Amino acid sequence: MAEDDKVFRRARERLVERLKSLGYIRSNRVAEAMLKVPRHEFVPEDLRDRAYVDSPLPIGRGQTISAPHMVAIMTELLDPRPGHKVLEVGAGSGYHAAVVAELVKPDGRVITVERIPELADFARNNLKKTGYDRFVKVLVGDGTKGYPPEAPYDRILVTAGAPDVPESLLEQLKPGGKMVIPVGDRHMQELWLVEKTEDGEIRRRRHGGCAFVPLIGEEGFQEPES
């Protein structure tokens, strides 16, 4: 293992231990996934030395990679299992999709929809160099409408703040499935766990405040005027 890799590995171990001690990581499965995925491979080159600081980082086009504690919270709530098919709305750098892929592989997979083509390319490259492209498919499009060709999904993860839960995503969620989504305004939201019962009833639970970039799309916020 190269010296840089050892340094990053130790930093990743310290971060995961801290997230466990603070209660953000509650399961061994999520701890192992976050230990395995090299976050420094999913941030811009000039920010690699900050990859294991618990804060969001800019990835271009006004978008960010979420803080590790928020990735842990959302992944614990989502509870992806081996064999699950997961839809992610907002690929960003591809990091969160890689963490989820660790939890659903070898037979599960992640479909992630990104509206910004340059970020979709960034995510694809990051996933390819880390080997997660075998389990993650990156698409360009309006994620608020989901991706009907692969529906229904066991789990849906939304990584941007929505004004409400998009109806298309509810329709594409399997009975018995779970969705994690930030709901609120363009700046501050609450993190919701949305569950669809086996008979199709929708249940929502709130899990505290958060701050995500706005979810832009037909069933989200409109693109701000320039």
Curated annotation (Swiss-Prot):
The active site is at residue 66. Its EC number is 2.1.1.77. It catalyses: [protein]-L-isoaspartate + S-adenosyl-L-methionine = [protein]-L-isoaspartate alpha-methyl ester + S-adenosyl-L-homocysteine. It is found in: Cytoplasm. It is an enzyme of class 2 (transferase). InterPro entries: PCMT, SAM-dependent_MTases_sf. CDD domains: AdoMet_MTases (cd02440). It holds the Pfam family PCMT. Keywords: Cytoplasm, Methyltransferase, S-adenosyl-L-methionine, Transferase. It comes from the Archaea. Its main location: cytoplasm. GO terms for molecular function: protein-L-isoaspartate (D-aspartate) O-methyltransferase activity. GO terms for cellular component: cytoplasm. GO terms for biological process: methylation; protein modification process; protein repair. Belongs to the methyltransferase superfamily. L-isoaspartyl/D-aspartyl protein methyltransferase family. Catalyzes the methyl esterification of L-isoaspartyl residues in peptides and proteins that result from spontaneous decomposition of normal L-aspartyl and L-asparaginyl residues. It plays a role in the repair and/or degradation of damaged proteins. NCBIfam families: pimt, PRK00312.1, PRK13942.1. This is Protein-L-isoaspartate O-methyltransferase. The lineage of its organism: Archaea, Methanobacteriati, Methanobacteriota, Methanomada group, Methanopyri.
